[in-house]
Amino acid sequence: MATTETATDREAIASVVQLYIDGASKGDAAKLEEAFHEDARMFGSLGGQRYDVPISALIEEMTSQPLDSDGSFEARITSIEQVGDAATATVEEDGCWGGVSFTDFFTLVKIDGSWKITVKTFAHTGGEMPAA
């Protein structure tokens, strides 16, 4: 299968995903808004609750409850795949809200020369959510 991935695109994709990581960890709405397309959505399930929400709901949640609540948050981009103006990226997150782990799958699209996250799908991979 042929790929049209370039180093420049790969770096740009990684930068956009890093904006998400930085914004979510510290509750920085400006970074999150820069990373996501305005019509992006988030999907997943956590504690029996299914999520299918506009990205504005994620941004609101991350600004009110940043992932790095106690300094133990770690995230790493584990893969980036790109063909033309479409890409995927996977992020492993540990220490969310003190001890919850997730795997995030991002779909990105290059629009007018800029990469934007259009979909975030997450899987809860460990730890218990803190009591509200």
Residue ranges and their predicted role:
Residues 36, 93-95, 121-122:
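Short beta-strand segments enriched in hydrophobic/aromatic residues
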Residues 36, 44-46, 110:
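Generic secondary-structure microfeatures
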Residues 1-30, 34-38, 127-132:
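Short, low-complexity N-terminal intrinsically disordered segments enriched in polar/charged residues
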Residues 8-15, 41-100:
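Surface-exposed, charged secondary-structure patches
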Residues 101-128:
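Short beta-strand edge/turn micro-motifs at domain boundaries
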Residues 39, 55-61, 115-116, 128-130:
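Short alpha-helical linear motifs
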